[in-house]
């Protein structure tokens, strides 16, 4: 089980320098989604004072030819601050800054899905769409082997690991706890965490978040997890099926509701939304992973608590369905529903936008509707 060389560097020595005063200066780490649509990049700049709002953060640029976002002959891309969080690594007053990416001509970059998602969310703000996303992930050594697994064989079969306790059942809990606390410090709306069905697989939940906030908070939570794993010398994988065979995949189940769904009699509105989703299954499958459904095809097999990628289904408390209505929602006749389609490496902006387009804007067909400004 290989760990990175950086994890063997003395953290005590680093801590000695991190305690040095920084005067009035502030370090702002700018974070963005690269051309893959699923990986993150970051770089840091010095500010003269602590920013209190996005307006205090300057626009910046980067070399898009090194992030799969531009050609070398015209490589400058723009970073426009979109959301700001406390920095749990450098501590206050330093900041994490999630950015949107724009091309040389100020047009939105191809993987800047936040840009259109924000417009769609603004159109339905009076319906107060809430989201909660359940991010599953797998811990790996730098050699790609699952963290804690025997080097030349497999661990025992699935069964004792989900919410498991003990060194033989929970692999990597220190990472999970560090990530949880770092998210709380940063201001991420992290809701909880648990060990998952496959050993070395974990989940954290973010939400409820309203509108565009869902994507902002999940992307920053992912960034923080990558950085925590970097410190521990391991890798976090959001691959939806990291280990072939009789092992669970990794999803990002998405809980969705509107004000009407959360009020008395809301089950009627939930059922109406599910009916709309049933008629637009393939559109959602394409939106639910960065490769247009190819990644999810390895996960949505109809086995290991998944539905078939080829068929739409829904049911109360059914984890083998495309859409699950929680049992308490069925009992209380109001609440939310869970879309079990999104893959672990999905873009939350794409997922939440697709749900709003279909369920609230009543779009149909295989392509998103183009709205005029």
Curated annotation (Swiss-Prot):
* Required co-factors: biotin; Mg(2+); Mn(2+)
List residues of the GS beta-grasp domain. 24-106
Write out the annotated subcellular location.
Cytoplasm; Mitochondrion
Residues bound to ADP are: 336-338
Q: Which Pfam families match?
A: Gln-synt_C, Gln-synt_N
Under the heading InterPro entries, the entry gives:
Gln_synt_N, Gln_synt_N_sf, Gln_synth/guanido_kin_cat_dom, Gln_synth_cat_dom, Gln_synth_gly_rich_site, Gln_synth_N_conserv_site, Glutamine_Synthetase
One GO molecular function term of this record is: ATP binding
Which biological processes are named by the entry's GO terms? glutamine biosynthetic process
Q: Gene3D superfamilies attached here? A: Glutamine synthetase, N-terminal domain, Glutamine synthetase/guanido kinase, catalytic domain
Q: What drives induction of this protein's expression?
A: In the retina, down-regulated upon application of glutamate concentrations of 15 umol/eye or higher.
What is the purpose of this protein? Glutamine synthetase that catalyzes the ATP-dependent conversion of glutamate and ammonia to glutamine. When expressed in liver, it may be involved in detoxifying intramitochondrially generated ammonia. Also acts as glutamate decarboxylase by catalyzing the production of 4-aminobutanoate (gamma-aminobutyric acid, GABA) in a pyridoxal phosphate-independent manner.
- Name by which UniProt lists this protein: Glutamine synthetase
Please name the source species.
Gallus gallus
Q: Which gene encodes it?
A: GLUL
């Amino acid at each position: 089980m290989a760990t990175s060389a950086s994890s063997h560097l003395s953290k005590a020595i680093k801590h000695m320098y991190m305690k040095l005063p920084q005067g009035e200066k502030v370090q702002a780490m700018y974070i963005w989604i690269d051309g893959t649509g699923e990986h993150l990049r970051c770089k840091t700049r010095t500010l003269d004072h602590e920013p209190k709002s996005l307006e205090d953060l300057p626009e910046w640029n980067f070399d898009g030819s090194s992030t799969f976002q531009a050609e070398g002959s015209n490589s400058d891309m723009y970073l426009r601050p979109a959301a700001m969080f406390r920095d749990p690594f450098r501590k206050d007053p330093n900041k994490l800054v999630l950015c949107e990416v724009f091309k040389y001509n100020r047009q939105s970059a191809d993987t800047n899905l936040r840009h259109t998602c924000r417009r769609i969310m603004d159109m339905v703000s009076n319906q107060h769409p809430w989201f909660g996303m359940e991010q599953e992930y797998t811990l790996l050594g730098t050699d790609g082997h699952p963290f804690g697994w025997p080097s030349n064989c497999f661990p025992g079969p699935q069964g004792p690991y989900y919410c498991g306790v003990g060194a033989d059942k929970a692999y990597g809990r220190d990472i999970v706890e560090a990530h949880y606390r770092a998210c709380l410090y940063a201001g991420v709306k992290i809701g909880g965490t648990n060990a998952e069905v496959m050993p070395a697989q974990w989940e954290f939940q973010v939400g409820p978040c309203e509108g565009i906030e869902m994507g902002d908070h999940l992307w920053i939570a992912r960034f923080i997890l990558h950085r925590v794993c970097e410190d521990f010398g391991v890798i976090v994988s959001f691959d939806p099926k990291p280990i072939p065979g009789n092992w669970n995949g990794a999803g990002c189940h998405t809980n969705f509701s509107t004000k009407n769904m959360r009020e008395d009699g809301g089950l009627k509105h939930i059922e109406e939304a599910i009916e709309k989703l049933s008629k637009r299954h393939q559109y959602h499958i394409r939106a639910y992973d960065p490769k247009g459904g190819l990644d999810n095809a390895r996960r949505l097999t109809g086995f290991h608590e998944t539905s078939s990628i080829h068929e739409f289904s829904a049911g109360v408390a059914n984890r083998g369905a495309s859409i699950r209505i929680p049992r308490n929602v069925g009992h209380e006749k109001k609440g939310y529903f869970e879309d079990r389609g999104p893959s672990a490496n999905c873009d939350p902006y794409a997922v939440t936008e697709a749900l709003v387009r279909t369920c609230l804007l009543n779009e149909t067909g295989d392509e998103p509707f183009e709205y005029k400004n």
